[in-house]
């Protein structure tokens, strides 16, 4: 071990937008990532389709609808926001209803276009019908997040930076969204606990 090697390392690299390579068109430059939309880095048009109805997608849809956009949201699971804690989900769903956000569930997106998506019925695998939602000004990708410290090819991790760190440092801690994306409160508490115990 080198004398310059640290005694401990905290990996808090955060996360980045999940991009599933088997969905055609997902990397097209016209597709806006949810984080870029929320930060104002990428503007969106009036009529918006949010792809992904988990916590991030649902909150993005509500945010845009609150700002006056005509918003639709599409989700593969059978409900919007199933991963949102119950107390928060009640208010989130009320907001989506209040702002007339159009909701499409049980919809497995197979292709993304600059103005919409094509999808299949996720609840009925025997249904081979390909449906389309088109005519949007902007498509926002909010299917979740993955750790930034790994390199992935699709869903498979092909490089893990932490393994390299462990070779030079005896104590390596991964915290927050670097483990998995979740609420900021959870990530902050985790980082605090690790810092106290080093």
Provide a role label for each language-model segment.
Residues 57-60, 79-89, 149-160, 165-167, ...:
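A conserved FAD-binding loop/helix module that cradles the flavin
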Residues 49-65:
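Glycine-rich adenosine-cofactor-binding loop
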């Amino acid at each position: 071990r080198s004398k310059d090697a640290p005694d401990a390392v905290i990996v808090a690299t955060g996360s980045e937008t999940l991009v599933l390579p088997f969905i055609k068109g997902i990397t097209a430059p016209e597709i806006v990532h949810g984080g870029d939309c929320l930060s104002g880095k990428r503007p969106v048009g009036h009529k918006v389709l949010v792809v992904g109805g988990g916590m991030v997608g649902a909150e993005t849809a509500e945010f845009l609808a609150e700002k006056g956009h005509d918003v639709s949201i599409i989700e593969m699971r059978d409900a919007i926001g199933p991963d949102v804690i119950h107390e928060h989900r009640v208010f989130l769903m009320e907001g989506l209803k209040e702002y007339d956000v159009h909701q499409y569930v049980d919809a497995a997106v197979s292709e993304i276009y600059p103005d919409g998506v094509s999808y299949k019925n996720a609840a009925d695998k025997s249904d081979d019908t390909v449906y389309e939602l088109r005519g949007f000004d902007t498509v926002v990708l909010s299917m979740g997040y993955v750790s930034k410290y790994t390199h992935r090819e699709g869903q498979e991790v092909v490089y893990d930076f932490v393994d390299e760190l462990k070779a030079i440092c005896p104590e390596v801690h991964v915290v927050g969204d670097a483990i998995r994306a979740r609420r900021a409160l959870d990530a902050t508490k985790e980082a605090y606990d690790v810092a106290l115990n080093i």
